[in-house]
């Protein structure tokens, strides 16, 4: 990678500089390599998260104990009709057709624990802010990140690292949850964020942004801190059109909030809708000369949920078994096609940021606790 090459050459140059001529050639070489790092690489990354979607629904589809349970489903027969199939592979296909029809043929899907593929959190909190910090930095920080309070993240995310290394306009974050301004530390990082119920401030606004701002104020959300994912998705697409970012992060939130509400029907509908939103982003990338054949998609979740007792599916946290169980999907440039990983392996959420650093030629963090890139060969 170019960053590693720069570091090596810098060290060599320091040992070689004994006169002005050597200094001149080393400085010229370093400047050329730095220019190539920021101008030549055509790698793009779309990082996407689905808040609190269990691995069980992703890999097995609708839960037999919940799909007709009137405590959690208002219209059991309607849900059963579209979501239920006898075989798990058919159920998951009904729930997330893009993932199981198309992504499985062009990437790698980790986290089916029934097949021995495991993904876990390395943080000990097992809820959202610590989970997103781990995903976006590559390291758990239980000492500083132990609540969902709106506290500026003391840690540098890969978004901030990208903004400082390259062009800050070429990176952005869009999220349904209003805490992300603090998770990304928008004020310090300078990364453009549009989170919660924020209107677009990406001046000058175009017609789409003006309309989205109006609609967001006119259409109520079921929650006070999380907007509907359709707004997050459309704000992100407008930014893609206006700025063609090389690194974009989109965080969808409906799955977690419907689960907390105990509404299994809406939880499944949100998962199915998000599958379609991801398909829309992939289609967008394939129709763009800027993104086609140059883009890696990485999709994951910030935490799992409970299974036993049955009511624990609504919640998560270190007191609920299974809340540390996650999953990872990767496809696109640089990802070999292995489909659903069926061999025994153990990944952690702290490996996502290092993998993105590798894709985007960003320096790796070498301190203890940081994950290592995922082996995609």
Question: Where are the language model's segments positioned?
Answer:
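Catalytic-site neighborhoods of secreted/periplasmic enzymes
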Residues: 124-215
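Histidine-centered active-site microenvironments of extracellular/periplasmic hydrolases
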Residues: 69, 300-331
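Non-catalytic, well-ordered alpha-helical segments in soluble enzyme domains
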Residues: 165-166, 343-376
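Active-site His/acidic residue clusters
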Residues: 234-280
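Bacterial Sec-dependent N-terminal signal peptides
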Residues: 1-42
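Metal-dependent active-site segment of extracytoplasmic phospho-/sulfohydrolases and closely related
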Residues: 46-47, 55, 274-314, 356
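Short, structured active-site-proximal loop/turn typified by the sulfatase FGly-forming signature C/S-X-P-X-R
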Residues: 56, 60-125
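Short, solvent-exposed loop/turn and secondary-structure capping segments
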Residues: 56-62, 114-115, 146-148, 174, ...
């Amino acid at each position: 990678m170019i960053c590693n090459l720069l570091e090596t050459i810098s060290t060599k140059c320091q040992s070689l500089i004994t006169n002005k001529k050597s200094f001149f050639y080393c400085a010229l070489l370093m400047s050329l390599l730095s220019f190539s790092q920021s101008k030549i690489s055509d790698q793009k990354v779309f990082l996407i998260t689905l808040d609190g979607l269990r691995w069980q629904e992703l890999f097995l589809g609708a839960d037999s104990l919940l799909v007709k349970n009137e405590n959690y489903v208002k219209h059991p027969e309607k849900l059963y009709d579209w979501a239920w199939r006898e075989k798990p592979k058919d159920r998951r296909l009904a729930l997330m057709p893009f993932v199981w029809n198309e992504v499985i043929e062009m990437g790698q899907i980790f986290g089916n624990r029934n097949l021995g593929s495991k993904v876990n959190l390395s943080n000990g909190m097992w809820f959202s802010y610590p989970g997103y910090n781990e995903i976006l930095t590559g390291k758990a920080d239980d000492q500083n990140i132990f609540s969902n309070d709106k506290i500026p993240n003391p840690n540098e995310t890969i978004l901030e690292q990208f903004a400082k290394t390259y062009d800050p306009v070429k990176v952005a974050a869009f999220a349904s949850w209003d805490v992300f301004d603090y998770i990304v530390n928008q004020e310090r990082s300078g990364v453009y964020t549009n989170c919660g119920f924020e209107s677009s401030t990406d001046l000058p606004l175009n017609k789409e942004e003006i309309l989205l701002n109006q609609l967001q104020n006119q259409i109520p959300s079921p929650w006070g801190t999380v907007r509907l994912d359709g707004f997050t998705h459309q704000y992100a697409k407008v930014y893609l059109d206006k700025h063609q970012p090389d690194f974009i992060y989109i965080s969808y939130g409906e799955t977690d909030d419907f689960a907390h509400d105990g509404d299994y029907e809406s939880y499944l509908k949100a998962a199915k809708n998000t599958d379609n939103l991801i398909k829309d982003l992939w289609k967008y990338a394939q129709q763009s000369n800027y993104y086609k054949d140059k883009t890696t998609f990485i999709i994951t979740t910030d935490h799992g949920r409970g299974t036993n007792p049955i009511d624990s599916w609504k919640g998560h946290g270190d007191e609920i078994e299974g809340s540390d169980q996650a999953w990872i999907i990767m496809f696109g440039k640089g990802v070999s096609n292995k489909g659903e990983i069926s061999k025994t392996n153990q990944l952690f959420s702290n490996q996502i940021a290092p993998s993105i650093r590798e894709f985007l030629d960003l320096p790796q963090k070498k301190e203890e606790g940081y994950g290592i890139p995922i082996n995609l060969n």
